Amino acid sequence: MALLMSAYPDLSVRDLRDLLARNATRIDAGQQPVQVSYTAANGQPRQVTGLEGWERNAAGLWYSPTYGFGLIDVNKTLTAAANHTPLPPLVQLPAQKVTVPRSEGSIADVGSSATRSSTQVAQALTVEAVQVTVSLDHQRLPDLLIELVSPSGTRSVLLNPNNSLVGQSLDRQQLGYVRTKGLRDMRMLSHKFYGEAAQGEWRLEVTDVSNSSRQLTLVDLNTNRRSTLTERNNSQPGQLLNWSLRVIGHDAARS
């Protein structure tokens, strides 16, 4: 970054990021997605992607949640910078909030399909990043897979299942009650849609992928003391309450 800035001091941070992303080299190209298999409540086996490997978005850019856009190629980026056209001014759309009707927001335990909610973006923008906030009720957050699907069909995992959001189970074990019902305006950001068209339908999907109890070992870093935490399955379905979408990008007509 410093080398690029010294060679081309007039380029903005957004332009530098654009150059780095478009000229990066894919490493560990054989990286495979992490698949999560479970038996749905209807008895049918189901498999979902809990963490993506390398995937190419609709703008033709490769992206991995592990490696981002890839390894920086300094020489290639410097060469491209010589003929780079600066990006149009940044546009940050207001957050579009979607309140989900109760009849549509139930998150089934080990569901045979995802709970879905959609919103439309009318503006013709080229995406640089997408910000999502989510509010939902659920008694065991590590069961949840949260994904965002773009108008072009690109799918980005925003929250991985088997995550470390174990505070509810810890409260239940240590306090006898739970202080939180789930997520409230949890903010998540995705760069996977970089370069895609923002206009069209964006869809949020939430899936509960587990109904089995789990045991975790917790380590106190101060005392090195170990304790066991039992995560019991949620006793009732979750509920998607609301979510919002905010697109950050630039005028597609000026790209």
Features from the language model and the residues they span:
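Active-site/binding-pocket entry motifs
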Residues: 26, 77-78
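Loop and turn regions of beta-sandwich accessory domains that flank beta-strands and are enriched
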Residues: 62, 81-255
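Hydrolase catalytic cores
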Residues: 1-62
